[in-house]
Amino acid sequence: MSVTNVTCKIGDKEIKFETGKLALQAPGAVVVTSGETNVLVTTVANETVREGIDFFPLTVDVEERMYAAGKIPGGFFRREGRQTEKAILACRLIDRPLRPSFKEGFRCETQIIATVLSVDNENEYDVLALNAASLGLQLAGVPLDSPIGAVRMSLINDNWVPQASNTELEDSVFDMVIAGNLNEKGEVDIVMVEAGASDNAFEKIDAGSKAPSEELVADGIDSSKQFISELIAAQAELVSKNDVPVTDWPLVEDFSKELKSDIEDSYKSEVENITSITDRKERSNKQSELEEKVVEKYINEEEDNTKAIKLAFKSLVKNVVRDRVISLSLIHI
């Protein structure tokens, strides 16, 4: 396997993706570099589904090592300590946009491990690892609806700066990590926004910096789409340079399309009424009553399809709530 790499420029930062050099036994292995920060991300997925499993067993782990900073662990045993809060948050950051991006029905056990090889205290590794994880899954041939691109946007001196260094972040008022994918039109859809103000944001605003108004934040999100598109394009370029394994991945169907369609035709209006109830307890009780009613109507005692009925009903509720959020920009939960 030859070493291949792709470099893209996000703002004034270069991000390099490389594969074919480390962790060659892993189906998907990517080293992502920005400055002197290097992260190895490996992805592995079983080709079979564990019997009886009713969820997607995705594991994301971030391994920080003292050698990445050129240090030896302290303490008597000279061993690495427990996972830091930063590493835990990085795991969640990687998991959130990727988990819903897998093909519907994909239940094969999947593992993503990001190992921090080196840090330069200027370029954070979390967003880099997220992009590399998306690329690693593609190299492993794991079925995704769309690759994920992610970028950190920081409000510095009243301007949105992508992938700001830690030195630049000292002047930041507001920061966002934005992840997106490509829709059928080839346009970027935002799938995750994680945002927060800096520790001394109020002091900076009092000193004359712009506050992160709704319009300003919307501009930042809109600006991120260009960078997300470039990152996804860089991933696609590296994938095209490698032989991706073709695997017939098994997809699990929790319920038939006919069952869901019948339930939707018969009960969608009732679900819409129930989800509009503002009292949480009353809404929950009404939903449980309707679920029992649906189960009684469609149950097949010979096949024991109760679980499939409940999952189909749950899917209907989920879709109705989602449509309500999008159409009304409102949710009472």
Locations of regions flagged by a protein language model:
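Extended amphipathic alpha-helical scaffolds
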Residues: 1-46, 50, 147, 247-331
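Conserved mixed alpha/beta core segments that line enzyme active sites in large multi-domain catalysts
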Residues: 2-18, 115, 120-124, 151-154, ...
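Glycine-rich, flexible beta-strand/loop modules in the N-terminal catalytic cores of phosphate-handling
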Residues: 14, 26-111, 116-123, 194-206, ...
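Conserved glycine-bearing catalytic or ligand-binding loops at nucleotide- and phosphate-handling centers
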Residues: 54-61, 129-132, 310
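Small-residue-enriched alpha-helical segments and adjacent helix-cap loops
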Residues: 73, 77-79, 93, 111, ...
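Stable alpha-helical structural segments in soluble proteins, enriched in small hydrophobic residues
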Residues: 97, 128-140, 220-223, 227-231
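Mobile "lid/hinge" segments at catalytic clefts and subdomain interfaces of large enzymes
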Residues: 143-269
